């Protein structure tokens, strides 16, 4: 072998244009594998798609204002769970002491994961599936996020329909859940809760008018024997669901230009209502005692594993990571947007909202506890029962009860709408970016998505719909989300590389993430997520609703729903490997190498070229260890030859239509060859350079 030439044992690669063309710009590139066996050269080739041009990236829709994006993210992250879940967990797990594990997990895992998703979407400017061009074998992680978002839409929209039903029912002089004199009430209904008693004289359990209105007047649960006896959809709830679907469609059909305007109402209204309810709640008798119980500090509870587990799980679900929503929203940002600042702002607002909503919730719970002379623990609960039974019951006892009920359910409606918009946007953006046909017909595709969620949501508005709702809530958005986020952070930090990801962020913000963020992404967050996944499986309990226990077949169906989203990751990985040419080692090398060059999308249209990631199992070769050679021109076969050192100047390769090589990519003076794997990274293709292994 000639002097100065890198030794390539038995295999070499050529990256050359598939056919000669005079037009400038990105070309389709043919990847040719040349393998020498027994003196015979065997070739295999495949056609590589060119990277997205800067012009195409510039054409992507962007938010009209920065505030549109921030309100959309805040509106999505701050949802109904902030009202019904966090205050209860805080009270249950030692009051103010619960903030210690909550804030700890927020800092070491919640904010880093939130920041990672915002940066991932903003840099790649695609939806949940498209961003995985950074590691094609893990594109299934994006489809998992899209599928989970779709599943959540099947039952989350029903909560909004319930809130709308309550809102419409509040426009009366007397709220329908005030007394027991309605057709849906049972003999067990009691207008007042007896102190320290939950049973009537004959041993039958007592129920409140608010509880019977929700379960019998709205859900008609008494007409169903279980999940195997659903009955027909209730026309009242179906009508409310139709209105919700129509509202979602017209909020989303034109993309972020319309949704960005809607969130100015849906994201800000809850704060106005929460403030009004807080002013009213703290004046009620018993409110101070309940707030004191909410904030009481019991540091001994920190020795209990359940407290830390509850905090970890709450962090995962309260921020909305793993659903593709943050990726979709940030993909419409300007390339130079400061996503780090956005992550800090939105996560802080989310946590403060969760904490402050506890004052509102417990002021009314304290009022109810004193009114019925029962301990605060007897009325404190989480889930739909808090906002559709306990809270309406408290509002019904206030002067101007109808006014306060309207205000409260307007808040629930707006909290639900912008969160549902985020979930739908994840599905629409994620699939539209993958399939251009859907992108060209976004309005029609949006209609199909919302119609699909409507049709499947009908199962949740039947007589036994609450059982379907509980099953979906238990399985569709549980372990599968945690698994998806775990695979996401492994893909970014270990396959794509935390150093390259940091370089991407530096291009956008001008600042490389500090060592703290890199350590969180690479070590702390994966360990945290693995811990939560294991705990969620180990502490699994079969779903139930009240005294009703789901049959075994329903539990099996729930696990099948969860597995259907998680299985997309290995299925797509197997498909990707099978669809690539070459040996198993070559397939794996190409499957974990980014598909396209990441470019800076700005008004200048320039796209800085990065050294390609050289696959070696997992991880990346640094560019200083690469051996750079010019590709041969069209029609020339055989292995490439090394280039002279490009010191202090740039060099263009006209036949590729590529820009000159930046000075910072000047190869080192000594050429170090790496294992014989093919490098097919478009960053090399676009400059006419190929890295020889």
UniProtKB/Swiss-Prot annotation:
Region (Interaction with TGFB1I1) location: 558-587
Ligand binding (chloride): 314, 318, 354
Tissue/organ expression: Expressed in the neurons of the substantia nigra of the brain.
One of the record's GO molecular function terms: metal ion binding
GO biological process, one term: amino acid transport
Cysteines joined through disulfide linkages: 180-189
Broad class of the protein's primary localization: membrane
Subcellular location: Cell membrane; Cell projection, Neuron projection; Cell projection, Axon
Pfam families with a match to the protein in the record: SNF (PF00209)
Binding annotation for dopamine: 79, 149, 153, 317, 419-420
Cytoplasmic side of membrane: 1-56, 497-513, 581-693
Regulation: Inhibited by GBR 12909 dihydrochloride, amphetamine and cocaine. Inhibited by zinc ions.
Residues on Extracellular side: 172-233, 285-303, 374-397, 540-550
Binding site for Na(+) 2: 77, 79, 82, 318, 350
Biological role stated in the UniProt entry: Mediates sodium- and chloride-dependent transport of dopamine. Also mediates sodium- and chloride-dependent transport of norepinephrine (also known as noradrenaline). Regulator of light-dependent retinal hyaloid vessel regression, downstream of OPN5 signaling.
Oligomeric and partner information: Monomer. Homooligomer; disulfide-linked. Interacts with PRKCABP and TGFB1I1. Interacts (via N-terminus) with SYNGR3 (via N-terminus). Interacts with SLC18A2. Interacts with TOR1A (ATP-bound); TOR1A regulates SLC6A3 subcellular location. Interacts with alpha-synuclein/SNCA. Interacts with SEPTIN4.
UniProt name for this protein: Sodium-dependent dopamine transporter
């Amino acid at each position: 072998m000639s002097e100065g030439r890198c030794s390539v044992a038995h295999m070499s690669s050529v990256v050359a244009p598939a056919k000669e063309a005079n037009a400038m710009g990105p070309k389709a590139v043919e990847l040719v594998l040349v393998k020498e066996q027994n003196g015979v050269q065997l070739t295999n080739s495949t056609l590589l798609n060119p990277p997205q041009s800067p012009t195409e990236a510039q054409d992507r829709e962007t938010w009209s204002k920065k505030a549109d994006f921030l309100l959309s993210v805040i509106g999505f992250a701050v949802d109904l769970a902030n009202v019904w879940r966090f205050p209860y967990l805080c009270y249950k797990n030692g009051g103010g002491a619960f903030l210690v594990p909550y804030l700890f997990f927020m800092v070491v895992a919640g904010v880093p994961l939130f920041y990672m998703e915002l940066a991932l979407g903003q840099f790649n400017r695609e939806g949940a599936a498209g961003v995985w061009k950074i590691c094609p074998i893990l594109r299934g992680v994006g489809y998992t996020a899209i599928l989970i978002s779709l599943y959540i839409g099947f039952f989350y929209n029903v909560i909004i329909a319930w809130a709308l039903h309550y809102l419409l029912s509040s426009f009366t002089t007397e709220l329908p859940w005030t007394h027991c004199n309605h057709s849906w009430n049972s003999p067990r209904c009691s207008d007042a809760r007896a102190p320290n008693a939950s049973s009537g004289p004959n041993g039958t359990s007592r129920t409140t008018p608010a509880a019977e209105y929700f379960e019998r007047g709205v859900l008609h649960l008494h007409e169903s024997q279980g999940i195997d006896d659903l009955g027909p959809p209730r026309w009242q709830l179906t009508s409310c669901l139709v209105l919700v679907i129509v509202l979602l469609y017209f909020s989303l059909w034109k993309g972020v230009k319309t949704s960005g305007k809607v969130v100015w109402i849906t994201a800000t209204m809850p704060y106005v209502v929460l403030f009004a309810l807080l002013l009213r709640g703290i004046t009620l008798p018993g409110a101070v005692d309940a707030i004191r119980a909410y904030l009481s500090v019991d540091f001994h509870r920190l020795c209990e594993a359940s407290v830390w587990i509850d905090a970890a799980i709450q962090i995962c679900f309260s921020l909305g990571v793993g659903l593709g929503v943050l990726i979709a929203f940030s993909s419409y940002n300007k390339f130079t947007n400061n996503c780090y600042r956005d992550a800090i702002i939105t996560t802080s607002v989310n946590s403060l909202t969760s904490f402050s909503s506890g004052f509102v919730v417990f002021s009314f719970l304290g009022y109810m506890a004193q009114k019925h002379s029962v301990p605060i623990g007897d009325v404190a609960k989480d889930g739909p029962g808090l906002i559709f039974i306990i809270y309406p019951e408290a509002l019904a006892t206030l002067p101007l009860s109808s006014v306060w009920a309207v205000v409260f359910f307007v808040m629930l409606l707006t909290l639900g709408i912008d969160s549902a918009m985020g979930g739908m946007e994840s599905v629409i953006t994620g699939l539209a970016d993958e399939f251009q046909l859907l992108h060209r017909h976004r309005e029609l595709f949006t209609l199909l998505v919302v119609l699909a969620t409507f049709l499947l949501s009908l199962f949740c508005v039947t007589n036994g719909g609450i059982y379907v709702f509980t099953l979906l809530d238990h399985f569709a958005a549980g372990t599968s989300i945690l698994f998806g986020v775990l695979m996401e952070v492994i893909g970014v930090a270990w396959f794509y590389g935390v150093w390259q990801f940091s370089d991407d962020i530096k291009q956008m913000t001008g600042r490389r993430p500090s060592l703290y963020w890199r350590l969180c992404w690479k070590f702390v967050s994966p360990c945290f997520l693995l811990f939560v996944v294991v705990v969620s499986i180990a502490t699994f309990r079969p779903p139930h609703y009240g005294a009703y226990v789901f049959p075994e077949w329903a539990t099996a169906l729930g696990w099948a729903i969860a597995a259907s989203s998680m299985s997309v990751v290995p299925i797509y990985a197997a498909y990707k490997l099978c669809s690539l040419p070459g040996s198993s080692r070559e397939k794996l090398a190409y499957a974990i190498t980014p598909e396209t060059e990441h470019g800076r999308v700005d008004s200048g249209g320039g796209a800085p070229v990065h050294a390609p990631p050289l696959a070696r199992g997992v991880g990346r070769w640094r560019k200083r260890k690469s051996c750079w050679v010019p590709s041969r021109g069209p029609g020339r076969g055989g292995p490439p030859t090394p280039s002279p050192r490009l010191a202090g100047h740039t060099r263009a390769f006209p036949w590729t239509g590529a820009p000159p090589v930046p000075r910072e990519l000047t190869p080192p003076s000594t050429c170090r060859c790496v294992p014989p794997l093919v490098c097919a990274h478009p960053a090399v293709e676009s400059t006419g350079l190929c890295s020889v292994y």
